Amino acid sequence: LRGPRAGFVLTREENARNLDRTVFPGMQGGPLCHIVAGKAVCFGEALEPSFREYAQAIVDNAQVLAESLLEGGILLASGGTDNHLMLADVTPIGLTGKIAEEALDRAGITVNKNMIPFDQRKPLDPSGVRIGTAALTTRGMGTDEMKRVGAWILEVLRAAEDESVGQKVRAEIASFCADFPVPGIA
């Protein structure tokens, strides 16, 4: 779902009381009405037939991006993806997840450093990065654009310490994204 971060728990009546006691107040604060409203809009979108197409486009985009990274020598946990994200092991190209995250961020590409299965590194400086395609898909990007995004990721990672590469890619991305504005912000 697009929209604010939040969670909902669906349960049976006989479990509701225990669940309420477990979650609130210890694990959850008070409800924020703007978050509840945002999630309501998201659930409304999910009821529309176009949401199924959007969800499939996210997966299609992730698979093309994953293939692009694999072809470029990046290892992916599970060898690819069948959902909206992928977990890339960047150690074979001499990087850590933290270094990769920082280099990509300087270039205008947002990923999260992330541990990989059986990671020997510490959580704050793991071996991988997590990459998703939901935001790109929301902006209207398709599989052709994912090939370009994959090329940018590879270019930045191969020159992670070279800030001029990051600056060049950042400028290219800014120009590229002008054709894919964030919905509702124009």
Spans of model-derived segments:
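Active-site C-terminal subdomain of aminotransferase-like
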Residues: 1-96
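Short, well-ordered loop/turn and helix-capping segments at boundaries between secondary-structure elements
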Residues: 11-13, 25, 45-48, 92, ...
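Solvent-exposed alpha-helical segments within well-ordered globular domains of core cellular machineries
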Residues: 17, 67, 102-105, 151, ...
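Composition- and surface-driven signal marking solvent-exposed, interaction-prone regions
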Residues: 22, 54, 82, 100-102, ...
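PLP-dependent enzyme catalytic core of the Aspartate aminotransferase-like
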Residues: 60, 123-186
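Conserved PLP-binding catalytic core of the aspartate aminotransferase-like
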Residues: 75-140
